[in-house]
Amino acid sequence: MATDPRKILVTCALPYANGSIHLGHMLEHIQADIWVRYQRLRGNDVNFICADDAHGTPIMLKAQQMGISPEEMIAAVSEEHQKDFAGFDISFDNYHSTHSDENRELASHIYLELKKNGFITSRTISQLFDPEKEMFLPDRFVKGTCPKCKAEDQYGDNCDNCGETYSPTDLINPKSAVSGATPVMKDSEHFFFDLPQFESMLKEWTRSGSLQSETANKMQEWFESGLQQWDISRDAPYFGFEIPGETNKFFYVWLDAPIGYMGSFKNLCNKRDDLNFDEYWKKDSTTELYHFIGKDIVYFHSLFWPAMLDGAGFRKPNNVFVHGYVTVNGAKMSKSKGTFIKAGTYLNHLDPECLRYYYAAKLNSRIDDLDLNLEDFTQRVNSDVVNKIVNLASRNAGFITKRFDGKLADNFVEPELYNEFIAAADRIAELYETREFGRAIREITALADKANQYIDEKAPWVLAKEEGKEQELQEVSSVGINLFRVLMAYLKPVMPELAARTEAFLNETLTWEGVAQPLVAHEITKFKALFARIDPKKVEAMIEESKEDAAIEMAAKEKAEAEKEKASQTELDKDPIADEIEFDAFEAVDMRIARIISCEEVPKANKLLKFQLDIGGETRQVFSGIKSAYKPEELEGKLTVMVANLKPRKMKFGMSEGMILAAGPGGKELWILEPHEGAQPGMRVM
């Protein structure tokens, strides 16, 4: 008996809106998309949503560095993110932003409900404060020397060198990463979510049996160490939502970020008449809610998020599906090695379905890291998808289209073999449901091996050359096409584009239940190449582009740091005062007021301007290297200061009879000295 479709809401963690999507992000989004597509293939009602996490100090500061508003920056990043996800066929029903009216309304509502119910407290805390930028500094915006190993230039929360964790106040010689100033301690009132009040509820939720064992075990460790109140506020300046009823106080980004799931769904509900927000989020909802996240944010999703929802009168997630990190070639992704690969860079060179297949082949339901070994990636995709699966169609389609006008045989001659393929449906379905995608792929490729073994044994290419074997040729080739059809129905959640091309070739929509019966007397279309092999040269080109991107990014970062360092220096830092001289030496220099009678460019000279100067009854010709800073017509008629007793110097372009005084580091940053109009040509400068 048919059961009612399940109503499911699925989310991915919200990418932060200050950078590009990379292949580490794509693991989660591909994993979730495969699960979502499987559920849809089985007839379930799934809404798949995401958004950009668009608040916080890093976004505010990066926008300042770029000279644009945070709103402009997050809009551009959102456009890039959505383009990348679309490129990988991530089938979101809605992609929104935490910087939205829906999210502001929901964040305020949840906060006020928590406050009304006694779950919000406040107290004064002391924090490091940048006196130049007049802002409190998050841990990652303080740098200094590690208190344990003494490594320099370490962040305020942990040391990259020795792994020690600490408070920013523990750093030796701390400096603001924003301005370079030495931070000071300053008091401020902050607001806290009283997480310990939810300990019994969270323990019960943990013992429900639905969470991954690794997550449940980690939560037990946190319970044993004691739950702490959670600081949910930040002081101005801050890019985010102001806390209702407070001045210059903002929600910490991690309060409104998970509420972004609700905000994105609310936005989707506003676009559609068939969705009811409360049906999915009310406390007694019978719909299903699942979050796909990385292991680095388990703390927020398994403790704070369900507690916030419960305290504000909303339902909790059915489960939080956690995955590990992505490594490349057995190591952490590296920009210098070109293995820190952006999604857009990958799409410039390779088919997204290749990565979807490879990730699926290695994914399981545990919190294991996944290694993207690029050599294995090439070999596995070419071996499995091209040689085993797609080749099954290409080996048989030509006989059907050329010899039988594209028509499959009127009867199916291998029912036992076909039933073996169909019998695997329940096993593969269970593996998809439980996110054991790697095992599902192994089941599918094992079936592909059996299908190819059958074709090898029947050898249709031999039958095609023998007289009187026409019917057998059609029947054998039809079996091959039908077995390929079943395999592609099973692979449809993983490789939707290949499935779509297969549907066009078969002249049929692939459904899970529809392949239970083979196609007989069915007309297919002319076979076209369905899938291309991975060319190792394209993988190499992707790595090279990643290296180039990293080099450009590093150069820009170094330039920005140099400019920041330069801006923090005084003029004396840049150009220290020269050694002392005796007064007589200074008195020997005769400086006079001069009026610029004329000024002109010197042909074939890159830096020089030619001046005629009136120094009070005498005219002097002087050459000065300030062409990069001034146009000649800007200077004519102005007063300036010259060294009048400098020995004349014969130059290529004529005799220079003195020196005009100017200040500045050079280039366009030069300024001639201009005395007040009361000064007259010829007056001595004392």
Swiss-Prot record:
GO MF: ATP binding; metal ion binding; methionine-tRNA ligase activity; tRNA binding
Record InterPro entries: aa-tRNA-synth_I_CS, Anticodon_Met, Met-tRNA-synth_bsu_C, Met-tRNA_ligase_1, Met-tRNA_synth, Methionyl/Leucyl_tRNA_Synth, MetRS_core, MetRS_Zn
Binding locations of Zn(2+): 146, 149, 159, 162
Principal localisation: cytoplasm
EC top class, as a word: ligase
Positions occupied by motif 'KMSKS' region: 332-336
Cofactor: Zn(2+)
Catalytic activity: tRNA(Met) + L-methionine + ATP = L-methionyl-tRNA(Met) + AMP + diphosphate
Cofactor note: Binds 1 zinc ion per subunit.
Protein known as: Methionine--tRNA ligase
Sequence similarity: Belongs to the class-I aminoacyl-tRNA synthetase family. MetG type 1 subfamily.
Binding site for ATP: 335
Documented EC number(s): 6.1.1.10
Gene name in the database record: metG
Keywords (A to Z) from UniProt: Aminoacyl-tRNA synthetase, ATP-binding, Cytoplasm, Ligase, Metal-binding, Nucleotide-binding, Protein biosynthesis, RNA-binding, tRNA-binding, Zinc
